A protein has these predicted regions:
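Glycan-binding loop/region signatures in secreted carbohydrate-active enzymes
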Residues: 346-348, 353-423, 451-457
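Substrate-binding surface in catalytic domains of secreted glycosidases
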Residues: 146-168, 244-377
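Conserved, mostly hydrophobic/aromatic
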Residues: 137, 234, 295, 349, ...
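Glycan-recognition patch characteristic of GH18 chitinases/ENGases
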Residues: 112-213
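Short, acidic/polar
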Residues: 119-133, 202-225, 277-285, 414-427
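Acidic/aromatic/glycine-rich contiguous surface patches that form carbohydrate-binding/processing clefts
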Residues: 422-458
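Feature responds to low-complexity, polar/acidic, surface-exposed segments characteristic
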Residues: 1-10, 14-34, 40-69, 75, ...
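Active-site groove signature of glycoside hydrolases
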Residues: 212-247, 297-306
Length: 458
């Protein structure tokens, strides 16, 4: 091939955008809409998501081949239908259509992160300068509780074994962030399933919960001389079932009405949908999106926490902390045009940069049934001392191997590559907001290669 386009075609083939199994390029043939979609998805490097995408329902009734590629291209907003549920895969892609597809690709790939949020909780003050660069921060200073006497309180004190409390010297960080133009929210945490049912499944209790929250976000904090909160972030975790789903929405509607009257905003943290279907399904994404100002999808805690004796014996250690296909599945669900958040600008991708899990092997057998969680400094020390690090293109997560006598440690973790990959995928799905759990744990130094995670959002 000596034609003018040879180098471009060769480069495209080398990067997987073209099927190099074919013997001929057929340069004079017209390209079909299906071929164009496949080529663009391959060129973007998302082949590893095709199987997951193919399992989803197609918006088109006439797609019989390359369903995963076309579904992905549709999710990315690269292609659209021809009306009446038709994609017309074998139709010729006109020059106009090809140009439009490529322009959409370019715009998505080069879009900016337009919203950065962080959770501020335990030992977060050390990263106050990072917090000042964010658009909003949620202070993890309260926990919702249903007391034995039937009262519902927003506990902000270190009583009743509560670690979600207002710290000494709170006024300093509030002043610094607000002077920097950062929105400050009160994060209201609840993870007890029984208490969630008691509070949400009773109309009087829902109202009592709303009143307790409103009291906390309107009362004057003495050392500050005013209330520190410009909004509320609801972080009710572990909700399951249709009853809780419905009543959680009722609670949010009531809370939003009260907050709006005070000129305050509402953020809601939600669990992501997962491929196996066994996830926390008590979150009506569409309804929540209509109520909340921001919806934070917590795309973390995917990794195995405990393993069975059989798995230990097998020596199976492939437990990425944020598998790429799972993150895609969650983003697909929360941006679904029928059941997801209608306005994708409200959706925020939540990530946990310090997440990691370690499995220790001896003679090919895993000796710990419970995953080990390391602090990031320990991981950096391992890498500095010669630990072997690899990057899984399938899961888009790094993992390292550490030799310690007769023990081999296998550790899955996050780094700037895995965070960037998730952010890039989210942008392709129309999600340009990110959130971090949590300040104090965001790697922001160039200790080793790919260690400066904060650099991905600066």
């Amino acid at each position: 091939m000596n034609q003018w386009y040879f180098k471009s075609v060769e480069t495209a083939a080398q990067h997987g955008a073209l099927d190099d199994s074919a013997q001929n390029f057929r340069p004079n043939d017209n390209i079909t809409r299906e071929e164009m979609a496949v080529m663009l998805v391959k060129g973007l490097g998302y082949d590893n998501l095709v199987e997951t995408a193919a399992a989803a329902a197609s918006p088109f009734t006439d797609v019989t081949s390359n369903k995963g590629y076309i579904n992905l291209a549709y999710d990315f907003g690269i292609v659209s239908g021809k009306g009446a549920g038709q994609f017309v895969p074998n139709g010729t892609a006109t020059r106009e259509e090809a140009a439009a597809m490529m322009l959409r690709c370019y715009n998505k790939m080069n879009s900016d992160t337009d919203f950065v949020h962080g959770f501020y909780a335990f030992s977060s003050y050390g990263q106050k300068d990072l917090a000042k660069e964010m658009d909003a921060v949620s202070f993890g200073w309260s926990k919702m509780e249903y007391r034995d006497d039937g009262s519902i309180v927003v506990n902000t004190l270190y009583e009743n074994n509560n670690e979600w409390a207002v710290p000494e010297g709170y006024e300093q960080i509030v002043e610094e962030l607000q002077n920097s133009g950062v929105q400050t929210n009160l994060n209201v945490f609840l993870s007890d399933a029984t208490q969630a049912q008691t509070i949400l499944n009773n109309a009087e209790n829902r109202t009592a919960a709303v009143n307790a929250i409103m009291e906390e976000v309107t009362v004057t904090y003495k050392k500050l001389g005013r209330n520190p909160y410009e909004g509320v972030t609801i972080d009710f975790e572990g909700l399951r079932g249709s009853t809780l789903k419905q009543n959680f929405v009722a609670f949010l509607k009531e809370l939003d009405t009260a907050l709006t009257a005070e000129g305050k905003s509402l953020y809601v943290a939600v669990h992501p949908a997962t491929k196996d279907g066994s996830y926390y399904d008590g979150y009506d994404y569409k309804a929540i999106g209509e109520i909340a100002d921001k919806v934070i999808m917590m795309a973390y805690d995917y990794e195995a926490k405990n393993i069975s004796a059989d798995v230990q014996q097998s020596g199976f250690t492939t437990t990425p902390v944020s598998p790429f296909d799972q993150v895609y599945y969650g983003l697909h669900a929360i941006t679904d045009e029928n059941t997801g958040v209608t306005d994708s600008s409200k959706v925020v991708l939540g990530m946990s940069p310090s997440s990691n899990v370690e499995w220790d092997l001896q003679n090919g057998v895993i000796v710990n049934s419970q995953g080990i969680d390391n602090d990031y400094d320990t991981l950096q020390t391992y890498l500095q001392n010669g630990a072997k690090s690899e990057y899984s293109e399938k899961y888009r997560n790094p993992y390292m191997t550490v030799r310690d006598g007769d023990t081999t440690k296998v550790i899955w973790y996050e780094d700037s590559r895995s965070i960037q990959d998730k952010m890039d995928l989210a942008k392709m799905m129309g999600v340009n907001g990110v959130s971090f759990w949590r300040l104090g744990l965001i790697p922001d130094e160039n200790t080793t290669a790919y260690s400066n995670i904060w650099s991905t959002v600066k």
